[in-house]
Amino acid sequence: MSEFELLAQDLLEKAEAEEQLRQENDKKLLGQVLEIYDQKYVAELLRKVGKNEWSRETLNRWINGKCSPKTLTLAEEELLRKMLPEAPAHHPDYAFRFIDLFAGIGGIRKGFETIGGQCVFTSEWNKEAVRTYKANWFNDAQEHTFNLDIREVTLSDKPEVPENDAYAYINEHVPDHDVLLAGFPCQPFSLAGVSKKNSLGRAHGFECEAQGTLFFDVARIIRAKKPAIFVLENVKNLKSHDKGKTFKVIMDTLDELGYEVADAAEMGKNDPKVIDGKHFLPQHRERIVLVGFRRDLNIHQGFTLRDISRFYPEQRPSFGELLEPVVDSKYILTPKLWEYLYNYAKKHAAKGNGFGFGLVNPENKESIARTLSARYHKDGSEILIDRGWDMATGETDFANEENQAHRPRRLTPRECARLMGFEKVDGRPFRIPVSDTQSYRQFGNSVVVPVFEAVAKLLEPYILKAVNADSCKVERI
């Protein structure tokens, strides 16, 4: 072969290798996007930036390897990249590492990422919540692990596995981290596991008392990985759940694990561990926050959640400011549903009960909504937006046509995102890739984001102190 023929062959082989690599990267990129958005929606968008005849079927065949490899155009590639979340501004220079357990849609994560943290592990079982999480939070494939079932990591559903083996497995599969975040579910502690382990001569302590609950999984990870700091979140009723037994087991466990819990002795009406979201946004939403410091680091002195008031906004947004100017009519209650809720509230009011809808006047700058719940998708009754319904006319002539035009409406998912603090009215939109029903569940199960942004700011100097203390220990070793 001549010199140029050899060159041509070499260039061809190089081009084919580059093309193959690009096709593999394009397929990987598409796969990441399809973990969040449905195929039909993505195909529609791709058709708008090029001449390729994309469809749900062509995407499905490509991603499943049932057709010849494809190469995206530059416009198509850019579109798909824009559909994924951007890395935080401080990437890749992170100040500390954290993990996000029972993550939901990332409400606790945001504050800790904002102060310079890197999320290296996320666990969330609900696949629809995972879609929303992945739509909004950057997850570096090289540094981050996603888990759908925490029990697969802790082996808590395999009682036959010896404890030492379980801890070794956790240590291998959960990345090292400085801060552990967890919004675990509230569950009663059963004595069944205790008696079984006693009969087997197994260890006492939290390994017995907390078995069978998802808090047990959190405790196992804390014991195995020994993070410097943890932040646990739960409903306010955790303190009184099961006549206080649940909370006692949790606090005893955290003490057994070697942690000082901030404000642990405070249990009364003004317990600083119970934080109401109304201080940050116009929604009454009380949550208990447990902040723990590893005892051997001796860094907990001076920390109290009472100081969170330092981060209250000077001017809390009013309820009306969070609303969209124009919404789809589907969010207005139907005459039948409004009549049902109206009569239901009247019936219980007559009995002296407080059950009923929560009507919020958006014109009143002091209005505070009730707690948004995961069942909001059913009827929206806990937070209804007043659209000018005349109560007096409603009492005498409920079917009055003019008054019926002012039936209340429920919040839109976008307004829920604002009420929970996932987005600001003039800020970057929070991406909602799921149905209204799913989004209502997700926001109703979440936390008021600014509360945990404030907790993160309060903790920032302690986290940096912990990182420094841990690194000094490693150097001495």
Swiss-Prot record:
Leading EC class:
transferase
Which reaction does this enzyme catalyse, per its entry?
A: a 2'-deoxycytidine in DNA + S-adenosyl-L-methionine = a 5-methyl-2'-deoxycytidine in DNA + S-adenosyl-L-homocysteine + H(+)
Q: Which GO terms describe its molecular function?
A: DNA (cytosine-5-)-methyltransferase activity; DNA binding
| Keyword Protein biosynthesis on entry | no
Could you tell me the Gene Ontology terms of the biological process aspect for this record?
A: DNA restriction-modification system; methylation; negative regulation of gene expression via chromosomal CpG island methylation
* Regions crossing the membrane: none
Active-site annotation: C186
Q: Name one Pfam family in it.
A: DNA_meth_N
Complex formation: Monomer.
**Protein family according to the UniProt entry:** Belongs to the class I-like SAM-binding methyltransferase superfamily. C5-methyltransferase family.
Would you tell me the protein name for this molecule?
Answer: Type II methyltransferase M.EcoRII
Species source reads Escherichia coli
The taxonomic lineage of its organism, from the top, reads:
Bacteria, Pseudomonadati, Pseudomonadota, Gammaproteobacteria, Enterobacterales
Q: Gene that codes for this?
A: ecoRIIM
